[in-house]
Amino acid sequence: MTDIQCVIFDWAGTIIDFGSLDPVLAFQSAFNAAGIQIDTDRIRQDMGIEKHEHIAKLAKMPEVQRAWFAKYKRGITDADQLQLFNYFEQFLLNRLSTETTLTPAVLQVQTYLKAHHIHIATTTGYTKAMLAIAAKQAGLLGYHPELMVSKEDVAAGRPAPDMINHIMTAFNITDPQTVVKVGDTVIDMQEGKNAGVLTVGLIESSSLLGLSQAKLIDLPQKTRLAKFAEITKTLKAAGADYVIHNLSELPAILAKYQTPQKEHA
């Protein structure tokens, strides 16, 4: 049995922003400002990758290119993409500054990890500027990871394993099976699998579900169960070793990998 040494969390949809609503709203607002409508599902399908890359992927979608050409009589340029990103970034920075809340059980899980001497780290699709504000606001609410990594710290963003590898090196961890990646997207699971670590997917707060806590509560039981089953299947297909409803279920999974001596230390 191998003790878990580090748990690496995603941010939006995992630690903050139940339903990962803010990035979707920011992407839609950026394209709406340019007169282009984008469906929420199309935005969410690549959720978790670095945000410049996400803008570029959205700009390459055939329906976006057709709408852009119809409006502007030309294709989308690099300058257009930069303008879209700048709008997106400012919108999201404002949301992070004013709307950041923790998802349920974050602080309880943090207490568990610290009590068991397990490192806490994060990876993200946020830029450093976004991460700085998210970390500051989450810190005011009591969440304090030891190490936070963005794509700007490494050669390649998610789903590449570079950010996780960076964290393992920083903590002198050599066995990836002593590391757990927790996230709410397909990209999170792929990142974890590419790094060879254990992966845990979240359902209730996830981008895949895409609902606020209030809307989740109002969801009919039959619909809820069907959606949960679909998300579980999606996360498992992406490489999730475990799929849980929310973070309150994480300690029970981690306990399976702790030696009795450490469990009762």
From Swiss-Prot:
Cofactor names from the entry are:
Mg(2+)
Any single biological process term in GO: organic phosphonate catabolic process
Its protein name is Phosphonoacetaldehyde hydrolase
* Any matching Pfam family: Hydrolase
Which GO CC annotations does the UniProt entry carry? Answer: cytosol
Q: What class of enzyme is it?
A: hydrolase
Describe the family membership recorded for this protein in Swiss-Prot or TrEMBL. Belongs to the HAD-like hydrolase superfamily. PhnX family.
> What does it do?
Involved in phosphonate degradation.
PANTHER family the record matches: PHOSPHOGLYCOLATE PHOSPHATASE (PTHR43434), PHOSPHONOACETALDEHYDE HYDROLASE (PTHR43434:SF19)
